[in-house]
């Protein structure tokens, strides 16, 4: 049976989620606690401690020293003559813990069950009965002779043996633990204990420093009696027990029976150990309930709360923090200085520089240690109360435990913990006192008006200090449920008077009067003297812990989880309104719905990203610890929801990776085409399939150079990342004004790296890549070719193309036009001037000038029609190597996109001209690009309204809005009339300029061909008819001239590669016809010439029009 039990325990240790450090990100640690968090909460241990070994055991305490004999025979039986407690023994890295309460390692364990103990005091909180002993305080471990397989371990501690002075008749603390389990389980536990004991020996010096600061050590070591005798030179001064040693403790020591309490605690310490080696028995809880002696109060607070264990790790942390940040200033220090003189002014110690200085140093040190919280309201009151009974270092560590574990969220920027407990308190009042709750609601009395200061100041500001400290005594032992029990008891006792109040003022007055009479008798008219001796405060404690004993930690936890979301939403809603209200003037360009959507999405992405990063970091740390030792596999869990606004200080800046996720949730072009490996690995490796539902549904973000430029553009400080203000300003510039010129300028500025208003060759190519990246997922109907454009050239195959294919052609045209209208840089201009001067000098040379003049394109035609010379095959090039190099260099130089020696750039006016010259690009910047950022539904509906630029008259919509299709309208002259067609816009203007240049070049070429052929006829002495020669020359010259003109123009504009030029099928037929003419005989040529000459003579203007049509067809291809 024992083997089966150990097997089940081992299986549970492997199944436990804490082994994998996977917190439930959708819930808090109270709702689904890990084994490690339960263990630390149960024994009040630092966050670095994890459960390594556990076993069922029985604690055997020695008999009382007063009843035991000093004889050797009886001393042998001391280990078996005292109280016996059955429970569970736990081992961590630096502590050995024993508890009689239900263990946190049960399969059905929760944080509430692990902190509940139904003993004589009706719930003693997380500490329970048992001990929490540092391993460094164990002096010796012996295995006793026992029956059969039982392992009996005798532990001897350093209790009372670390000081220089020891009390006469000192007896070391010794107790026995019997392990209950299989032999293998017991040996495994003993092996782990032995290993950790050796590692903890180096911390004995830290234990010595901590113990010497405890008043119990001074009290029981005999140093107090020596100090009272003035003749003893070796007497050491008592340790610092707070400002009360200098300015007296609150209350009358005689009425409080301080001496009697001190004697009771001294006796308990002698029998059960003290400070770090204290064993908790039921008497321990009773002594705390009746009140603590003044000089031992600070030490007992440390032991009960667990801050002593925290101070043991680094005893000099407080002094080191003050020395490290000495002389530095911060915003928290400024707030601290304002509240110093308002901290318990009724106590004399805080009216002097001594008390003010102590308070300043503790608050300042904590603000540097916990920079996220820094300093918050009411923290000065709590610390001032602690300093009355504790030293500065003790108050510093207790404040840390108070803020982080006992009342988390009470002292933060949002005070979400206090507000949450107000909801819990109201729900408990409604449940336990429904009549009073209904009356307060009918009278419109806010319960939080009086209860909020109770919880925030831990009743220090509400009750007289003497009674407030009695509440704190039980609070540090049993936890925050004491605050609710005392509050409910106050309302129950004053219920009859509270039913008569009608407003907040009278409500506060009744309770204030009650607090001022807490020292009076609760039954002044009673004839029973014992009953008459009971004070109102004693009555309050009895009602709190008896009538409201059903208020347990489980009750508080359930109510907190019930109201947590609503409270956080209220806090975050208030923070949202405040943040939006404080945004800059750029936010006025966006609607309130859009601003709200940006805020929600910004913090949702940031919160989710911070959570994943936290878990990934913890996973990495766990893997590192796993490599070094198996016992450290169980890592600390993520107890706090990182990044949520309502929980206090949270990250306010997002880095580039978080910005990618924000864009992916805002614009569909920012979504990756396929999930990246890093995201897959993060989802499967770090979370092991237990990630958040929202994170799993969120698409994977893309990573493009455009998104990086957008991040740098929006960020005011790239090192810190993007703030909410930066994101709002960036989106407002795009979606706010709805101005196409603004959008074009914004896009241009993204690629203006130097800020000089110029975009170079690489920038043009990256612009085109960005356009393709932004348009790869469609346009959602924001880009539609106009009907007039579709009817401009009916019957074209391009009309059957989709919008995406049309946009692809527009981007291609964008690249060509950018390089065509790009300006050369300064160095290029100087080189061109030098080359032009050289060409002018060379133009006066005599030789082959005539051949150069007509070498525009005829060589290609002649080389195809003229037979090759002997010794050359048709495939052999006829050009010399130098001529080929010259041709290649000329071709590259003619294409701006291929010539790296001639850097080019475009300016903003050129970029605007090229964009506005294309209808799809114009719609892209006017509609799609700003509307691609989807924010809110109302914002999307408003985006469908006509923009500012749509009401303007541009080249693309000129006459479109006002043009009415009527049958009887004035005849509009076409291009021949010198009027640009309305729907052609700026493209028509640019294309007509190019067409006129081509037509002029064709005419010049034609006349040069005629002059050349005339010279050839004179040289050959031909007797042909002049009219036939003219017709023949007209036929052979016109077509090649146009073809040559187009070829030379295309090479200059688009490059020398013929595949890059857009040539219509009719032009290709014309080229084939020219080849046939050159091959055929002379007679056939004359017949064709007669036909062509006849057609030319019949319509003198048709040839020019035909040539114009061919050229215009070339320009139409230029648009696509």
Swiss-Prot record:
SMART domains: TBC (SM00164). PROSITE patterns: TBC_RABGAP. Residues 864-878 have a biased composition (Low complexity). Residues 673-702, 859-903, 960-979, 1017-1068, 1081-1120 are annotated as: Disordered. Residues 1057-1068, 1081-1095 have a biased composition (Basic and acidic residues). Residues 1023-1032 have a biased composition (Acidic residues). Residues 291-479 form the Rab-GAP TBC domain. It comes from the Eukaryota. This is Putative GTPase-activating protein AN11010. Residues 960-970 have a biased composition (Polar residues). InterPro entries: EF-hand-dom_pair (IPR011992), Rab-GAP-TBC_dom (IPR000195), Rab-GAP_TBC_sf (IPR035969), Rab_GAP_TBC_domain (IPR050302). One of its GO terms (molecular function) is GTPase activator activity.
